[in-house]
Amino acid sequence: MDNGLSRRHEISELLQLVDSTTTRAFHTSNGSPKSDCRNDSKPLKRYEELFGSFPAEGLGTSGFKDAIDLISRNSVDNASPGFLGKLVSAPSAPGIASDLFLSILNNNGHVQRAGPALTAIEKHTSLELARLFDLQGPHAGGVTVPGGAAGNLMAMLVARNIVAPESKQRGLTPGEYAIFVSDAAHYSVSNSANVIGLGNDSIIRVPALDDGTMDADALQRAVDQAGKDGKKPLLIAATSGSTVNGAFDPLDKIGEIAHRVGAWFHVDACWGGGVVFSDKLKHLMKGSHLADSIAFNPHKLLGVPLVCAFLLVNDLRTLWLANKLNAGYLFHDDAPKKNGVSSEQSANTNGSEKESWRHSKLLDTAPDVMKINDLASLTIQCSRRHDATKMFLHWLYYGTAGIAREVEQAVDSAKHLACLVRDHPRFELIWDPEQVFAQVCFYWKSASTPEKSGETLAEINSRNTRALFQGIEEMGWKVDFAPGKAKGEFLRIACNRLTTRQTVEKIVSELVELGESLGL
């Protein structure tokens, strides 16, 4: 057998093993509203046998089969209807196929000549997403990034290098700039400030209202106070679909403040961004047109396989100016010069331009963004997977309306769950159904009281929450819990595009039965 035929046979054989092994291990076809997500009972010794050392001679097909069998039986089945704990779901069928397709092609996404067709797909898909998010700039577009945290990080780096262009050459002076984030924002936003050299003292946390959204009035006060303290606003970060309760910040109000004070306006829409596909839900992101950058993860609510994430921007020239470095051995796109000075050098200069950076002449030194094809020059990466292809094929397969229906199903199931929880005497719903996106947060109403037990209410709630969490997971469900500000830890159930009303009715019934059996 020649090498080509041998390789094809080898790939086919291994893929058949993957298919049969995962089908046996996961319980996605039994028709039950929940499926067992539990791991193997005693896997540790077998893990050690498998991962302790590599063999001198390869184990071939049999070793591969044994390994994936063990791994799959000790992995979480997120295709199970009972998987309601994390902000991700079963990967879509076209997504799985496209993931395999990308692995077979194995094209790098750093320069066009390494993957010409897939580069064109990334540019096209990013532009279509930017339009869907109502980014209206003539140079709007985006690039893929290796996750939502990476998107938030790159947005902050771009903000630093564009709002304060001298920082790309000299760094930032401690205490000169401030960033503003909600106290309900994802931790990666604050972490990004540390990575780019701002430090914790530069992070100003804005209080959230009772519904979990950023208080725009408090933001204005915080910006005013920072100015009095001698700090310039570098970036204001809003959230569309917060991690805990799915809150959507008022983008129109926050964006207006950001534009007025000259701050970069970033929106973390990693979880909630899928609403832009739905005419019924896209109002939740009213004001997105004001954003300078938006982080969006199709691998969350849309069900595109991990990792598929984008950083969308209103002006692609900002990505080029912020991230471009001289690497002529790799990037062959023409970099125009003005008066003999490269655009990179020009972007490193200081001047009065930074006060009106959205209309800065520095942006005009960037090349025509439609002609930028070496996409790594727009990012902080070099080697890049063509993850946009997964979104492209997923979108092509389902269409905008099909994606919208799945997003709407997740929200409908969550609101139905919220109503069930609200109406049951043993539960206390934290956020009302009309405030719910795709997560539902609630307490168990305990028979115990602080007077009876000597515990605080927060201690009682946290103890009950953990007991229910452990018990329901032992019954095959995957849920989660989170800390409350005053009343202790609460249960959190995250619905996804596959969650049905039948499933949430079932888990409510089993939680009630469990809580009463435990005497909580």
UniProtKB/Swiss-Prot annotation:
Binding residues for substrate: K86, L87, V88, R492
Annotated protein name in UniProt: Glutamate decarboxylase-like protein FG08083
Enzyme kind, highest EC tier: lyase
Function: Glutamate decarboxylase-like protein; part of the gene cluster that mediates the biosynthesis of butenolide, a mycotoxin that shows antibiotic activity but does not seem to play a major role in the spread of head blight in wheat. Butenolide is derived from glutamic acid via a 4-acetamido-2-butenoic acid intermediate.
Positions where N6-(pyridoxal phosphate)lysine occurs in the chain: K300
Entry keyword Lyase: yes
Signal peptide start and end residues: none
Keywords tagged on the record: Decarboxylase, Lyase, Pyridoxal phosphate
Region ranges (Disordered): 338-357
Highest taxon above the source species: Eukaryota
Inducing stimuli: Highly expressed under trichothecene-producing conditions.
InterPro entries: PyrdxlP-dep_de-COase, PyrdxlP-dep_Trfase, PyrdxlP-dep_Trfase_major
A GO biological-process term: carboxylic acid metabolic process
Gene Ontology CC terms: cytoplasm
Pathway: Mycotoxin biosynthesis
EC number(s) reported in the record: 4.1.1.-
GO molecular function: carboxy-lyase activity; pyridoxal phosphate binding
Cofactor: pyridoxal 5'-phosphate
